[in-house]
């Protein structure tokens, strides 16, 4: 019998993942790479994440729409793994259009993405308040409760906005249960079912032009040879399965989540770029072994403008942690590293790197995956010489001053993954790309 020849996957999809606690600078990398890709996909999270993009003397924060929207010709997709606040989405579309960029025909939203409703936001705040000292540090945007409904099989999806009868039935069913909680447990005012039905029934005509089966769309585009860039929100150490549980987000920012959150098959993924901030930050509660509580930590916060793009909250700051990074690179299968915010370290006489932990008097090199153990470790540091000068002019590694270049190559050697991108300033052009 004659053997048949079948086409093989093109492996033209690239995944960008945060390797730390989020806020690594993924937005700049996506913005920088977007003109090299046909499609950019957001695959998980919601409006709890903020990607800051700096270009043309403007600084723009996006929470839902992929950063590629600012590159003409680039198509943007919000995947099935994202939870969407319809009000926030429409506000963001309006903001992008006011900046002079077309959105219709360039933005597609998965019909299977779940919605964040007003009662999710209230539940988020009430749940957090009830935790007392054990608060997670949620943004209060309703992300967790929306994912709870999704996995309880009670969620309302984007496609339901297009069917008024279905939407009304699901809203009534959900509010019957939620209002009991508000009334009997939290002693709060109930939501008006009729008002919510009326308000959300108006979204069908507005959102309809953007809604499609993005799983099929992406599969067909990949088979046609198109290139796809997948961007996650938050970071590996906040992943609900692989992060510092329970101080985590409610989804999977890891590279595996890129496939489930977009519908793209794994064999289309050619490379995984891990975004690494040159130091570390964390928002909210949870263990942070290399956190600094002194003037150095304050300096990192001040120079790095480390305040949440979504909440405005001050971020906790510390030195880069190679133990955590090795774990993240392994979990995500990272093939190359994008090093960001190197410029924040420009004024430090010395820079420290956490190379291992001490636990109960013993040195360990593996990242503890249970939070009680992680909270007991202390960092072991290696001190490197600072460079005390700007590298904003650099466009190649050779353009950088020797000490900054040594810092990059030290990380590369320790992590055994090539550093192919170095951000030496906030601007799109302030980039070393190897």
Swiss-Prot record:
<feature type="binding site" description="in other chain">
    <location>
        <position position="313"/>
    </location>
    <ligand>
        <name>IMP</name>
    </ligand>
</feature>
<dbReference type="InterPro" id="IPR001114">
    <property type="entry name" value="Adenylosuccinate_synthetase"/>
</dbReference>
<dbReference type="GO" id="GO:0044208">
    <property type="term" value="P:'de novo' AMP biosynthetic process"/>
</dbReference>
<keyword id="KW-0479">Metal-binding</keyword>
<feature type="binding site">
    <location>
        <position position="23"/>
    </location>
    <ligand>
        <name>Mg(2+)</name>
    </ligand>
</feature>
<protein>
    <recommendedName>
        <fullName>Adenylosuccinate synthetase</fullName>
        <ecNumber>6.3.4.4</ecNumber>
    </recommendedName>
</protein>
<keyword id="KW-0342">GTP-binding</keyword>
<comment type="function">
    <text>Plays an important role in the de novo pathway of purine nucleotide biosynthesis. Catalyzes the first committed step in the biosynthesis of AMP from IMP.</text>
</comment>
<dbReference type="InterPro" id="IPR027417">
    <property type="entry name" value="P-loop_NTPase"/>
</dbReference>
<dbReference type="InterPro" id="IPR042111">
    <property type="entry name" value="Adenylosuccinate_synth_dom3"/>
</dbReference>
<feature type="binding site">
    <location>
        <position position="315"/>
    </location>
    <ligand>
        <name>GTP</name>
    </ligand>
</feature>
<feature type="binding site">
    <location>
        <begin position="22"/>
        <end position="28"/>
    </location>
    <ligand>
        <name>GTP</name>
    </ligand>
</feature>
<keyword id="KW-0658">Purine biosynthesis</keyword>
<feature type="binding site">
    <location>
        <position position="153"/>
    </location>
    <ligand>
        <name>IMP</name>
    </ligand>
</feature>
<dbReference type="GO" id="GO:0000287">
    <property type="term" value="F:magnesium ion binding"/>
</dbReference>
<feature type="binding site" description="in other chain">
    <location>
        <begin position="48"/>
        <end position="51"/>
    </location>
    <ligand>
        <name>IMP</name>
    </ligand>
</feature>
<keyword id="KW-0460">Magnesium</keyword>
<dbReference type="GO" id="GO:0005737">
    <property type="term" value="C:cytoplasm"/>
</dbReference>
<dbReference type="InterPro" id="IPR042110">
    <property type="entry name" value="Adenylosuccinate_synth_dom2"/>
</dbReference>
<feature type="binding site">
    <location>
        <position position="50"/>
    </location>
    <ligand>
        <name>Mg(2+)</name>
    </ligand>
</feature>
<dbReference type="GO" id="GO:0005525">
    <property type="term" value="F:GTP binding"/>
</dbReference>
<comment type="pathway">
    <text>Purine metabolism; AMP biosynthesis via de novo pathway; AMP from IMP: step 1/2.</text>
</comment>
<feature type="binding site" description="in other chain">
    <location>
        <position position="249"/>
    </location>
    <ligand>
        <name>IMP</name>
    </ligand>
</feature>
<comment type="similarity">
    <text>Belongs to the adenylosuccinate synthetase family.</text>
</comment>
<keyword id="KW-0963">Cytoplasm</keyword>
<comment type="subunit">
    <text>Homodimer.</text>
</comment>
<keyword id="KW-0547">Nucleotide-binding</keyword>
<feature type="binding site" description="in other chain">
    <location>
        <begin position="23"/>
        <end position="26"/>
    </location>
    <ligand>
        <name>IMP</name>
    </ligand>
</feature>
<keyword id="KW-0436">Ligase</keyword>
<dbReference type="GO" id="GO:0004019">
    <property type="term" value="F:adenylosuccinate synthase activity"/>
</dbReference>
<dbReference type="InterPro" id="IPR042109">
    <property type="entry name" value="Adenylosuccinate_synth_dom1"/>
</dbReference>
<feature type="active site" description="Proton donor">
    <location>
        <position position="51"/>
    </location>
</feature>
<feature type="binding site">
    <location>
        <begin position="423"/>
        <end position="425"/>
    </location>
    <ligand>
        <name>GTP</name>
    </ligand>
</feature>
<dbReference type="Pfam" id="PF00709">
    <property type="entry name" value="Adenylsucc_synt"/>
</dbReference>
<feature type="binding site" description="in other chain">
    <location>
        <position position="139"/>
    </location>
    <ligand>
        <name>IMP</name>
    </ligand>
</feature>
<dbReference type="GO" id="GO:0046040">
    <property type="term" value="P:IMP metabolic process"/>
</dbReference>
<feature type="active site" description="Proton acceptor">
    <location>
        <position position="23"/>
    </location>
</feature>
<feature type="binding site">
    <location>
        <begin position="309"/>
        <end position="315"/>
    </location>
    <ligand>
        <name>substrate</name>
    </ligand>
</feature>
<dbReference type="InterPro" id="IPR033128">
    <property type="entry name" value="Adenylosuccin_syn_Lys_AS"/>
</dbReference>
<feature type="binding site">
    <location>
        <begin position="50"/>
        <end position="52"/>
    </location>
    <ligand>
        <name>GTP</name>
    </ligand>
</feature>
<feature type="binding site" description="in other chain">
    <location>
        <position position="234"/>
    </location>
    <ligand>
        <name>IMP</name>
    </ligand>
</feature>
<dbReference type="InterPro" id="IPR018220">
    <property type="entry name" value="Adenylosuccin_syn_GTP-bd"/>
</dbReference>
């Amino acid at each position: 019998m004659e053997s048949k020849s079948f086409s093989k996957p093109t492996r033209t999809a690239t995944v960008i993942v945060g390797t730390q606690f989020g806020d690594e600078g993924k937005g700049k990398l996506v913005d920088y790479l977007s003109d090299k890709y046909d499609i950019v996909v957001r695959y998980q999270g919601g409006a709890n994440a903020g990607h800051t993009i700096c270009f043309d003397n403007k600084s723009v924060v996006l929470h839902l729409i992929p950063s590629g929207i600012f590159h003409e010709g680039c198509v943007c997709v919000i995947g099935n793994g994202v939870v969407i606040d319809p009000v926030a989405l429409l506000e963001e579309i309006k903001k992008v259009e006011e900046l002079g960029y077309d959105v219709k025909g360039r933005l597609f939203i998965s019909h299977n993405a779940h919605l964040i409703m007003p009662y999710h936001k209230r539940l988020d705040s009430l749940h957090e308040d009830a935790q007392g000292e054990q608060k997670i540090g949620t943004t209060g945007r309703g992300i967790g409760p929306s994912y709870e409904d999704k996995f309880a099989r009670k969620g309302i999806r984007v496609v339901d906005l297009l069917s008024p009868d279905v939407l009304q039935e699901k809203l009534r069913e959900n509010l019957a249960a939620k209002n009991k909680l508000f009334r009997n447990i939290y002693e709060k005012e109930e939501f008006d079912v009729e008002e919510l039905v009326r308000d959300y029934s108006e979204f069908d005509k507005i959102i309809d032009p953007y809604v499609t089966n993005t799983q099929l769309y992406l599969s067909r585009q990949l088979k046609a040879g198109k290139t796809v860039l997948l961007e996650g929100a938050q970071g590996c150490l906040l992943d609900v399965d692989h992060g510092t549980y329970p101080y985590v987000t409610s989804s999977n920012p890891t590279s595996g989540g890129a496939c489930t959150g977009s519908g793209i098959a794994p064999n289309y993924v050619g490379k995984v770029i891990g975004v690494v901030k040159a130091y570390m930050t964390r928002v909210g509660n949870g263990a942070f072994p290399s956190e600094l509580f002194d003037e150095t930590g304050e300096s990192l916060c001040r120079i790095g403008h480390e305040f949440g793009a979504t909440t405005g909250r001050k971020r906790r700051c510390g030195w880069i942690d190679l133990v955590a990074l090795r774990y993240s690179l392994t979990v995500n299968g990272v093939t190359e590293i994008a090093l960001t915010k190197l410029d924040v370290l420009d004024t430090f006489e010395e820079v420290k790197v956490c190379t291992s932990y001490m636990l109960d008097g013993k040195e360990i090199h593996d990242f503890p995956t249970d939070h009680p153990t992680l909270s007991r470790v202390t960092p072991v540091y290696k001190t490197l010489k600072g460079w005390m000068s700007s590298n904003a002019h650099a466009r190649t590694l050779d353009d950088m001053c020797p000490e900054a270049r040594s810092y990059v190559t030290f990380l590369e050697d320790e992590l055994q993954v090539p550093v192919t991108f170095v951000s030496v300033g906030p601007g799109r052009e302030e980039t070393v790309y190897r």
